[in-house]
Amino acid sequence: ATAKKDVTVTSKKNDNVPAATDNLPVNSYTALNYNEVKGVWIWYSELYPILTGKSESQLRSGIGEYYDNCLSLGINTVYVHVRPFGDAIYKSDYFPWSKYCTGYIGKDPGYDPLKVMIDEAHARGISFQAWVNPLRCYYEDDAPDVSTTYKTGQWYDTKDGDYIVKVKSYWWLNPAYKEVTDLIANGAAELVSKYDVDGVHIDDYFYPTTEAYFDSIAFNASSYSSLSQFRLDNCSRMIADMYKAVKSHNPTALFGVSAQGNVTNNETQLYADVEKWSKEDGYVDYMAPQIYYGFDNGG
């Protein structure tokens, strides 16, 4: 039988990662969310022309135009990419400045792009959801530039394929470790605690591969006999930790997942137990499946 204990592998490193969501205050802001959501994603490539190397006033003008276009289409909610690659378009204690701010990873743009985008959204009555990719980290060429001030920089520096693992051209965090999922939860808590975001949102990037090499060290150190169940439980723990982090720091903010539209693929290819998250309390406020196909598709 598959063992269902010891989901979190004991670290063999002295990383001194703080307990999840330590020392972050509760935000008294009342989140702006709608019963009927009409929303759009604004991903990092769409931020590039209005953010990268731009001044605060230029960003304010550019994002304002985006939002005005949204309003003209009846859109009341935006899901804005604030952490696409283990980085941040805001001042973070856990992740370096995104290269999409200045063109260089770790470089402070001299103002707070996230606050600008939130303020402009709220001025128009638009709900602002902070969209993060929790596991996807840096492109291979950017990774050496990440300061070891940050845990992801420290973990990359070890190059051991354990906490952070290279898959094709990108480095990915391994959610088998509590230190890793604590970092992810801290990142969610930081957004909700320090900013008047209306929610935290993630998409369909979970495990990047079905190959066993990705987490073989952690799996072999666990009591699991099934790699699939090991990964499903790791993802579920990460989602539960993020949900708790959001709700602990602003109970009115939402936490949701936009997973793939095919339940089987989610569970067998990405190890995202979307059925569990949808049915049980403590995981998500909503699911927004990515249904990019017609009724004739069997997915």
Predicted segments with their positions:
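Active-site-adjacent "subsite" loops/lids of carbohydrate-active enzymes
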Residues: 30-59, 129-130, 135-190, 194
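Aromatic- and acidic-residue-enriched carbohydrate-binding clefts of CAZyme catalytic domains
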Residues: 35, 46, 86-113, 142-174, ...
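Hydrophobic faces of well-ordered beta-strands that scaffold small-molecule active sites
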Residues: 38-42, 78-80, 128-130, 200-202, ...
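Active-site beta-loop-alpha junctions enriched in small/polar residues
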Residues: 43-47, 83-85, 133-135, 202-207, ...
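Acidic-and-aromatic substrate-binding clefts and catalytic sites of carbohydrate-active enzymes
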Residues: 56-57, 83-88, 107-108, 261-270, ...
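Catalytic domains of carbohydrate-active enzymes, especially glycoside hydrolases
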Residues: 61-87, 195-197
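Aromatic-lined substrate-binding rim segments of carbohydrate-active enzymes
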Residues: 66, 84-133, 227-249
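Polysaccharide-binding and catalytic clefts of secreted carbohydrate-active enzymes
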Residues: 76, 152-276, 280, 292-293
